[in-house]
Structures are given as structure tokens and as C-alpha cells.
């Protein structure tokens, strides 16, 4: 947006507000926001420039422009500083060319997971030439900060009850390459990949192929599937590793991956259940939940919900603006499938416009079309049920399974024993179980218009494990055995370096891995070849 247009919009806002506050006793905050008419003294000898019209704290002036990497970092850090009581920035790692993958977080207690507070994430710019998501998340960060400080009750409630993470650019290297062509260039490949020429949305472990095989086994669960060891033999982008570690470090409930090139909401599975079928409906066990999430975004987006609109050379009106990913086009190694099958998190792919790199004069209308939809999707983390699983002494039980009858996908409790289970309205049979404990089952009913998660706690009794069969549970070390992600720590600020070859291997809690004791007697002959093998797979 040009300075001239910015100035026009701001002047229009000032004129529109002239009837709102005419009292000479105008509150300072309202005066700074331009909600009050200036006094006679204030109207004398004023040379108006766009900079003069920038509202002061607490408001944030959103410039609807494209942001370079340095500009994006500056805006995010400035926003976090302005709202330091509810916001902070952190890096989850670095891109191949060394740029921080910077996240801005909003919550009542930034930097910490709070029991029974759901976690949400948005990821933008996974493909470097698809820039709409990048800009929308920069705008959203400023909007959340500004509206919170202005006393917007909806935003204050959202931030006080939710932990929100925004990663505007997963592929900053690709963006810089695409930006060289300039806004308006709508090429489909320039800058799409990262600096290693890797498509990040084809670079995640393919767990979907195995899930399609397991579906034929009646007792098999389609959740928290381990990463195949063979995956580490391939070429893995540092951006992919960083996001995978991030996914596992925080108990996200819902995620939205923002893309461009079409106007539709896609949901898992993205990989067809039949390898020879390019367009085959391949639903997850949570098909109805995914449809509910996708329809929520579409309903709040004026263009997606407009049934008279034919979009981007295609038309998804017959499907209500949503589509199963594999039914649209099939591919493996996608982030959304991995998120669903490896973690607790349900991820949507949000295709937000026909143009991948729109011009600046289109950005304001794109923001207006998506603002309400983005907020609405975040609020969906408060649907379904949540609770805490404890033993009879009140101690939380981590890694307990939360099962829903008829849905072959379980949710796992976190370190504090809390869980969040998205469900559609209606009646459900829900169970909690953990190794060494009795199983507890409850019947619940969720009203159609319930706007917050129902509280369903479980108390499990200790039982004698001898001569008793237990259902398959998540092993304590499922993420530790020979898993290179435990050798990769992207959470050090500014992308801390990976451990060097000479560093000793340890598990997440700082102890030696489970197999180390078998070799301790070997002294200097301990199996360094085994360590090197795993390190090389990084």
C-alpha cells in the first residue's frame, strides 16, 4: 500500500470518529488513537505526515506491505516488546542459510505451557513464493497485541485462555529468492523450495502409507506412529527438523498451515490410500472433526463462503469450499499428515488466494477477508473435551491414552496429565487408560452450541500388572531410541548449534539412552561407531 493510500485511510478514520468523542476531557488513550476531535490549539500549525499519523501506544499501526526478513524480525520483536506481559519471540532453529525461524507467542504466561490451556499454531510461508500467509501472520501478531491493549474483550479472553504461536515464515530463504522477482510475479516454482532445493511440504516422514496398511488391522491404532529409521537416510532440511522438534515439544491441539495458489481448505489425509489413485477420498478416523474445523474457516471467509464465485480456474463450491487432500491431489511427506499421525495436533492446509505473491494494494482486502476466519479457527481449540488424568493420590499420569469409541485415533496426556480432545457435538464414549492402571470409561454429551470444551477428568487406580494383559500404550522412550531429533535442539535462541561429534549421547532428561548400560563395561572400546551412525543421519 502506498503512503498516499495509507494517509487517505488514516484521515478517513479520523473524520469518521469525529462524533465519537467531542469532550475536552478525552481520555489520553482515545486521543492517541484519533478517537477525539483535536482542540483549537492542537489544530494550529500542524504539518501532517504519515509518520505523524502513526498512533502511539497502545495501538499498533499495521502497514499492509510486504516485509523483508529483517523487516519481519523487527516488527515481531517490536510487537512482543510492546505487549511484553502477554507476548514473546523465540527461535525454533535456523534455515539452511542461517536465518532464524522466528515465532511470536501470545498467552497469559508467555514461555510456559499452563495446565488445561490449549496450544494453537499457525505456520506461514512454507513455500517461499506463497507469501500471503507470511504477511497475514505479521498482521495478526500486531492486531492481537493492539486489540488486547485496547481492551477488546474477545481478544483478551482468547489470549488469556489460549497459548497462540505464530511462525510467519518457515522458509525465509525461499522467500528472499521469490522476492527478487517482485510482487505480482505468480510463478509456481521460483522460491518454492528452500535453499537446498527441497520442497518442505514433501520432506516430512511418510507415516500415511503405514497408516493405510494398519487400517486393515482391527486393533491397530492410527496415532503417535514412530518415525521410520530409514527416513534419516534421506535429505532432510533444517527447517523440517526444526518444525518437527517444535511439534513434539509443545502439545499443540490445532494447526493451520497457510498457503497460496487456490482458495480452499484442505485436510488430511493428503496421501491417497491407493498409490495409483491421484484423486481418491482418503479420510482419517477424525474425518468429521476435520470437516468441522475446515467449515469453520470457510464460513467466516466472505469469498470462500460465496457460492457464486468460481475461483482460481476451479470451483470447490460443490464441496462447500473444503476438500480432503488426497481427493484433490495426492502426495506423500506432507506436514499435515505427519502432524496428525505423530502428535496430538490436527492440522489444516489453508489455501488463501489464487495469487501466490500478490501486489501490496491487494494485501489490505486479503487481511479483511481472513481476519475473522483466522480468529475463529483459533477459538476452535476450545471445542470438544479437556481434562486431567490422575492416580488415586492425585498425581498426574503422563502419556495416558484418551480413546473415543468408534474413532481409531487416541490422544496422549502431557507432562501434567492434561489432555485436549476435539470432538463434534453429540454423545461419545470416552476412556482413559495407562500401563499399570485400571481403565475408566465415561459417556459424555456435547451440546451443538457449546462454545468451550467440556471438563472430563479421570482417576485411574493402580492394578497388579502380573498375569494381566494391557492394551498397547505409548512407551516412555518412543521418541528417544535412536531418534536424531533428540540430538537436534532448535529451541536455543538464534538457532543453537547441533552437538558436535565428540559430545556424549543423552536422552531428553539428561540420562544415558536405554542401551548405554550394555556397553559401559567396554571402557574406551564403547561403540562410537553406533553413535556416529546416528549422528550422520542428522
Name each model-derived stretch.
Residues 437-463:
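Structured interaction patches on ligand/partner-binding surfaces of diverse proteins
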Residues 119, 180-393, 410, 419, ...:
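Metallocarboxypeptidase
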Residues 22-100:
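Short glycine- and acidic-rich boundary segments immediately preceding or forming the N-terminal edge
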Residues 426-436:
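A short, solvent-exposed beta-strand micro-motif common in secreted/extracellular proteins
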Residues 401-425:
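Short, acidic Ser/Thr/Gly-rich low-complexity loop/linker segments typical of extracellular
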Residues 85-87, 99-101, 117-119, 160-165, ...:
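Loop/turn elements at helix/coil->beta-strand transitions in domains of secreted/extracellular proteins
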Residues 3-22:
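Cleavable N-terminal signal peptides of Sec/SRP-targeted secreted and luminal proteins
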Residues 132-180:
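Short helix-loop-beta-strand segments that form the rim/entrance of peptidase-like active sites
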Amino acid at each position: 500500500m502506498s503512503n498516499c493510500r495509507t494517509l487517505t485511510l488514516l484521515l478517513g478514520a479520523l473524520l469518521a470518529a469525529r462524533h465519537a468523542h467531542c469532550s475536552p476531557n478525552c481520555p489520553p488513550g482515545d486521543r492517541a488513537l484519533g478517537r477525539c476531535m483535536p482542540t483549537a490549539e492542537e489544530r494550529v500549525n500542524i504539518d501532517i505526515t504519515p509518520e505523524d499519523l502513526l498512533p502511539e501506544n497502545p495501538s499498533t499501526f499495521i502497514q499492509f506491505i510486504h516485509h523483508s526478513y529483517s523487516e519481519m524480525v523487527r516488527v515481531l520483536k517490536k510487537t512482543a516488546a510492546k505487549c511484553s506481559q502477554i507476548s514473546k519471540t523465540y527461535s525454533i532453529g535456523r534455515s539452511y542459510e542461517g536465518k532464524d525461524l522466528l515465532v511470536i507467542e501470545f498467552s497469559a504466561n508467555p514461555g510456559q505451557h499452563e495446565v488445561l490451556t490449549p496450544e494453537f499454531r499457525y505456520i506461514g510461508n512454507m513455500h517461499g513464493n506463497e507469501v500471503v500467509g507470511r504477511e497475514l501472520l505479521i498482521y495478526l501478531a500486531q492486531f492481537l497485541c493492539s486489540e488486547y491493549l485496547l481492551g477488546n474483550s474477545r481478544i483478551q479472553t482468547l489470549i488469556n485462555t489460549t497459548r497462540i504461536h505464530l511462525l510467519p515464515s518457515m522458509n525465509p530463504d525461499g522467500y528472499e529468492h521469490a522476492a527478487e522477482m517482485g510482487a505480482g510475479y505468480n510463478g509456481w516454482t521460483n522460491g518454492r523450495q528452500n535453499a537446498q532445493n527441497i520442497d518442505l511440504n514433501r520432506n516430512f516422514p511418510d507415516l500415511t502409507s503405514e497408516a493405510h496398511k494398519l487400517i486393515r488391522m482391527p486393533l491397530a491404532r492410527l496415532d503417535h506412529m514412530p518415525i521410520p529409521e530409514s527416513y534419516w537416510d534421506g535429505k532432510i532440511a533444517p527447517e523440517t527438523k526444526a518444525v518437527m522438534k517444535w511439534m513434539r515439544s509443545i502439545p499443540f491441539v490445532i494447526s493451520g498451515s497457510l498457503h497460496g495458489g487456490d482458495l480452499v481448505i484442505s485436510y488430511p489425509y493428503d496421501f491417497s490410500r491407493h498409490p495409483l489413485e491421484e484423486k481418491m477420498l482418503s479420510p482419517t478416523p477424525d474425518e468429521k472433526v476435520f470437516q468441522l474445523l475446515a467449515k469453520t474457516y470457510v464460513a467466516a471467509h466472505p469469498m470462500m463462503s460465496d457460492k457464486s464465485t468460481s475461483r482460481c480456474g476451479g470451483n470447490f463450491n460443490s464441496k462447500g469450499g473444503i476438500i480432503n487432500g488426497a481427493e484433490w491431489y495426492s502426495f506423500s511427506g506432507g506436514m499435515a499428515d505427519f502432524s496428525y499421525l505423530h502428535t496430538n495436533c490436527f492440522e489444516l492446509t489453508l489455501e488463501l488466494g489464487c495469487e501466490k505473491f500478490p501486489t501490496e494494494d491487494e494485501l489490505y482486502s486479503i487481511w479483511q477477508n481472513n481476519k475473522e476466519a483466522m480468529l475463529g479457527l483459533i477459538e476452535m481449540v476450545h471445542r470438544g473435551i479437556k481434562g486431567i488424568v490422575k492416580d488415586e493420590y492425585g498425581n498426574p499420569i503422563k502419556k495416558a491414552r484418551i480413546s473415543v469409541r468408534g474413532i481409531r485415533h487416541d490422544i496422549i496426556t502431557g507432562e501434567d496429565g492434561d489432555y485436549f480432545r476435539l470432538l463434534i457435538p453429540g454423545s461419545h464414549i470416552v476412556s482413559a487408560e495407562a500401563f499399570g492402571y485400571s481403565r475408566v470409561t465415561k459417556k459424555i454429551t456435547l451440546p451443538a452450541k457449546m462454545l468451550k470444551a467440556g471438563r472430563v477428568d479421570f482417576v485411574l487406580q493402580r492394578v497388579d500388572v502380573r498375569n494381566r494383559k494391557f492394551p498397547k500404550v505409548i512407551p516412555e522412550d518412543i521418541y528417544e531410541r535412536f531418534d536424531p531429533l533428540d540430538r537436534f535442539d532448535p529451541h536455543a535462541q538464534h538457532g543453537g548449534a547441533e552437538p558436535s561429534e565428540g559430545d556424549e549421547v543423552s536422552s531428553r532428561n539428561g540420562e544415558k539412552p536405554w542401551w548405554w548400560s550394555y556397553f559401559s563395561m567396554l571402557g574406551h572400546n564403547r561403540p562410537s561407531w553406533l553413535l556416529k551412525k546416528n549422528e550422520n543421519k542428522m
